[in-house]
């Protein structure tokens, strides 16, 4: 009896169960509104038959491109990209943003000078081939920012002690200890105690190209002012004074340009310009002391 049972079990194992044959075929129905209904069947993890209905709408998007661009896209690929599908491949091509190149006014003359210098002295790569990194503090072969003596020594080209003469006491930096090349000078007191010149110079350039705009409407916005003055040059900063409680403009603003010439042109054109039923008064901001 057990022998018959084993044979029956083997017979059941040998028979293959075809899931695809037991499922109804896929159905595609075209609707009057232009859509298609796709009906498919499958078995889930529990072995139950599941019916899936999807409605698909096909949309055709037409894009008008330059004929020359379309012609270049149809060119056959070569090299490692040979026999690949048209268009950029994601594994070999990275599509970036479109950068607008704006050459300077005298870019042709500059290009000729660079080309001439390159022909006489060789390319830039050849000039820098044998150059090594040199620290400005200890003259070592490392970057100045990584110098271990940057907090205790002054750069080689900077005077660290008195140089002699009648005004020796006046020229000696305050806080300097000892004399000679090994004297310690705090970073803030180097170059005769003028540690803040670079920061002041940056703000001074900013003030020279800053316009003060008065008689501004209470409904004015910084974005509108930036668009209005941005026609004359690159605007680096727009400050519109507003009331903290009402968030309304107080009537004046400051516009900073990257170039003073652009600021002068904007001052000439925008002084007396009508904006939101008011006449703007534009002038250069006074230098702070």
Curated annotation (Swiss-Prot):
Which Pfam families does the UniProt record give? Answer: eIF3g, RRM_1
Q: Which InterPro entries does this UniProt record tie to the protein?
A: eIF3_g, eIF3g_N, eIF3G_RRM, Nucleotide-bd_a/b_plait_sf, RBD_domain_sf, RRM_dom
GO CC annotations? Answer: eukaryotic 43S preinitiation complex; eukaryotic 48S preinitiation complex; eukaryotic translation initiation factor 3 complex
Q: Which domain of life is it from?
A: Eukaryota
User: What keywords were assigned to this record?
Assistant: Cytoplasm, Initiation factor, Protein biosynthesis, RNA-binding
Q: Main subcellular localization, coarse class?
A: cytoplasm
RRM domain segment(s): 209-287
Q: Which HAMAP family match?
A: eIF3g
The family annotation for this protein states: Belongs to the eIF-3 subunit G family.
Listed under subunit, the entry gives: Component of the eukaryotic translation initiation factor 3 (eIF-3) complex.
Full protein name = Eukaryotic translation initiation factor 3 subunit G
């Amino acid at each position: 009896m057990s022998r018959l049972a084993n044979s029956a079990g083997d017979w059941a194992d040998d028979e293959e169960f075809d899931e695809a044959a037991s499922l109804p075929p896929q159905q595609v129905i075209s609707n009057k509104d232009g859509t298609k209904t796709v009906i498919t069947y499958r078995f889930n993890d529990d072995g139950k038959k599941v019916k899936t209905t999807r409605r698909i709408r096909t949309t055709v998007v037409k894009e008008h491109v330059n004929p020359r661009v379309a012609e270049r896209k149809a060119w056959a690929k070569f090299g490692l990209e040979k026999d690949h599908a048209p268009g950029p491949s994601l594994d070999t091509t990275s599509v970036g943003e479109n950068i607008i190149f704006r050459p300077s006014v005298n870019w042709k003359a500059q290009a000729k000078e660079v080309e001439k210098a390159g022909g006489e002295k060789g390319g830039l790569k050849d000039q820098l081939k044998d150059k090594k990194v040199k620290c400005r503090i200890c003259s070592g072969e490392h970057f100045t920012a990584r110098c271990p003596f940057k907090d205790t020594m002054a750069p080689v080209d900077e005077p660290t002690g008195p140089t002699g003469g009648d005004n020796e006491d006046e020229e000696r930096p305050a806080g300097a200890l000892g004399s000679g090349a090994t004297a310690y000078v705090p970073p803030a007191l180097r170059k005769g105690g003028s540690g803040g010149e670079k920061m002041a110079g940056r703000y001074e350039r900013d003030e020279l190209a800053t316009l003060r705009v008065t008689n501004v409407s209470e409904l004015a916005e910084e974005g509108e002012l930036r668009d209005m003055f941005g026609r004359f040059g690159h605007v680096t900063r727009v400050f519109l004074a507003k009331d903290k409680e009402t968030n309304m403009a107080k009537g004046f603003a400051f516009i900073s340009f990257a170039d003073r010439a652009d600021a002068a042109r904007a001052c000439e054109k925008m002084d007396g310009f009508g904006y939101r039923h008011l006449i703007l008064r534009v002038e250069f901001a006074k230098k702070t002391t």
